[in-house]
A protein has these predicted regions:
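Glycine- (often His-adjacent) and acidic-residue-rich active-site loop
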Residues: 52, 60-96, 112, 142, ...
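Conserved CoA-thioester-binding segment of acyl-CoA-metabolizing enzymes
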Residues: 1-59, 95
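Terminal low-complexity tails and localization/encapsulation signals of metabolic enzymes
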Residues: 1-8, 251-264
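Hydrophobic alpha-helical membrane-association signature
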Residues: 36-40, 86-89, 192, 233
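Crotonase-fold acyl-CoA enzyme core
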Residues: 98-211, 239-243, 248-251, 257
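Short, charged, surface-exposed hinge/linker loops at domain edges
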Residues: 215-224
Length: 264
């Protein structure tokens, strides 16, 4: 069923079981603006608060675009104050998505350009259809990727290919994106959403309390020394023993039954 947790028609949400499907629906190219960005942030915050939601699948409406990035009309005036407001809206939306406690999967059903690729970079896993094209073409229009592009793309593919895409404006196809480690899977046209949803369903086999802790640890590895990460890992392990899910998971296995998670 659809939930009215989105404050904007440009971001649509449907929840089925433990999976939320979030659709960028801003014709014609699913661009980002000052309405859709705060809406995405609000949606992720609402999903974070819903303990029955374990996974989020993000896709674009229609068959051509996942998202073509920022609506450039808002930058035509050259107003730095507008740039600051929009930049902060991008940052808040995509960082909230990156920190979603469950698993986020981008179902890239078409062009993912600029902020459209950056929102996919903020997800945990990316599945692209074979016809999808990915690019960060901001410099071509006198701008730069300010919603994580220079940071997250570099972490995923290394400096060389980040520079080819950002500084040389190279657009890459889905197969090459998989070779580079930018997407985890390539599927036939029209199948990204179904494939992402099937993967999201697998998330529910794991304890949602474990998943949230593991995601925090994996993300923290980007910023801290491994010696600190190894300590944090043990601390998070012990912290799980204050959750109902730890008791349920361990005992369900020993009793040879399926666990019933509580997400607490």
């Amino acid at each position: 069923y659809s939930m009215s947790i989105s404050p904007s028609e440009k971001i649509k949400v449907a929840i089925d079981g433990n999976i939320a499907t979030v659709t960028i629906d801003n014709p014609a190219a699913n661009t980002w603006d000052r309405e859709s960005l705060p809406a995405l942030k609000a949606v992720v915050e609402a999903l974070n608060a819903d303990l029955s939601v374990y996974a989020l699948v993000l896709t674009g409406a229609g068959e051509k675009f996942f998202s073509a990035g920022a609506d450039l009309n808002q930058f035509a005036s050259g107003d730095a104050d507008v740039a600051r407001v929009v930049g902060e809206a991008f940052g808040e939306a995509f960082e909230t998505l990156a920190d979603f406690r469950g698993v986020s999967i981008a179902a890239i059903n078409g062009f993912a350009m600029g902020g459209g690729l950056e929102v996919a970079l903020a997800c945990d896993i990316r599945i692209a259809e074979e016809q999808a094209a990915l690019a960060l073409p901001e410099a071509r229009v006198g701008l730069l990727p300010c919603a994580g592009g220079t940071q997250r793309l570099t972490q995923l593919v290394g400096e060389g290919w980040a520079k080819r895409m950002i500084l040389c404006g190279e657009r890459i196809g889905a197969q090459q994106a998989q070779t580079l480690g930018l997407v985890e899977e390539v599927v036939p046209a029209g199948e990204a959403l179904a494939t992402a949803t099937a993967l999201a369903a697998k998330v529910g086999n794991q304890s949602p309390s474990s998943v949230a802790a593991c995601k925090r640890l994996i993300h923290s590895a980007r910023n801290i020394a491994i010696s600190d990460g190894l300590v944090a890992e043990r601390d998070e392990f012990v912290a799980l023993f204050s959750t109902e899910d730890q008791q349920e998971g361990t005992n369900a296995f020993l009793e040879k039954r399926e666990p019933e998670w509580k997400n607490r």
